[in-house]
């Protein structure tokens, strides 16, 4: 069995539920409104449009969130942690590798303006989904690629898009996709200072970078 001390040194190893930090019962305090969309409540309620939710992990959530809030049809974004064991973790706890969580962006979108398939195309093309427990220079389980689906339809579309993107990656000489695709677990929202971080700090770090490979146009639309 891998020991806790080994995970602290090698953050590419997922902890077990028994090894994970205990966390806490209290969620992080969040601002009421989205920093970019101003009058839009960060977590709703959302009264206009055909609202749906998507959850993506593609490396550091600062840069990922910015790319999604820039997309027409997205009405709100929130960053957080998901896929692990520790309830309501702090950023420092996630960075330790002892929570099992990956950094994610919860994307709130209007299906009449942008489809889930279009968001999936963005997801695949914005990062390198073949790198396992890392994304570029960001190394550890918290940077693993993930799609967490809020419905069976999303799960089906996510897997189909993965297979299509794998075909394109293979043609370009890339390896196998390591993206975790599953039904949505609990998303624990990150601390307030992480929300819309690059809008508050325009010169801040952004580790997002794709492979240059694109999905075929026929798979990018509705």
Curated annotation (Swiss-Prot):
Gene3D superfamilies xref list: Peptide methionine sulphoxide reductase MsrA
Pfam families listed in its UniProt record: PMSR
Entry's Gene Ontology cellular component terms: cytoplasm
Alphabetically ordered keywords of this record: Oxidoreductase
GO biological process: cellular response to oxidative stress; protein modification process
InterPro entries: Met_Sox_Rdtase_MsrA_dom (IPR002569), Met_Sox_Rdtase_MsrA_sf (IPR036509), MsrA_MetSO_reductase (IPR050162)
Catalytic reactions of this protein: L-methionyl-[protein] + [thioredoxin]-disulfide + H2O = L-methionyl-(S)-S-oxide-[protein] + [thioredoxin]-dithiol; [thioredoxin]-disulfide + L-methionine + H2O = L-methionine (S)-S-oxide + [thioredoxin]-dithiol
EC number assigned by the record: 1.8.4.11
An annotated Gene Ontology molecular function: L-methionine-(S)-S-oxide reductase activity
Active site location: 60
Protein function: Has an important function as a repair enzyme for proteins that have been inactivated by oxidation. Catalyzes the reversible oxidation-reduction of methionine sulfoxide in proteins to methionine.
Similarity comment: Belongs to the MsrA Met sulfoxide reductase family.
Protein name: Peptide methionine sulfoxide reductase MsrA
Gene name of the encoded protein: msrA
């Amino acid at each position: 069995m891998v020991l806790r001390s080994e995970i602290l040194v090698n953050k590419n190893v997922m902890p077990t539920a028994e090894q994970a930090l205990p966390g806490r019962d209290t969620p992080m305090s969040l601002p009421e409104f989205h920093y970019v969309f101003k009058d839009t409540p960060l977590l709703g309620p959302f009264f206009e449009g055909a609202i749906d939710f998507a959850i993506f992990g593609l490396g550091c959530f600062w840069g990922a969130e910015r790319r999604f809030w820039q997309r027409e049809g997205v009405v709100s974004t929130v960053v957080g942690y998901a896929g692990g064991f520790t309830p309501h973790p702090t950023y420092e706890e996630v960075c330790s590798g002892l929570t099992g969580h990956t950094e994610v962006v919860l994307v709130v979108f209007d299906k009449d303006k942008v489809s889930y398939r279009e968001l999936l195309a963005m997801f695949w093309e914005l990062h390198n989904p073949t790198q396992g427990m890392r994304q570029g220079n960001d190394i550890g389980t918290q940077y693993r690629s993930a799609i967490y689906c809020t419905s069976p339809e999303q799960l089906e579309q996510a897997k189909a898009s993965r297979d299509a993107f794998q075909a394109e990656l293979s043609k370009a000489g890339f390896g196998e996709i390591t993206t975790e695709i599953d039904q949505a677990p609990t998303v624990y929202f990150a601390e307030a200072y992480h929300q819309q971080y690059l809008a508050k700090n325009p010169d801040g770090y952004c580790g997002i970078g794709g492979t240059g490979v694109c999905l075929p146009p026929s798979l990018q639309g509705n």
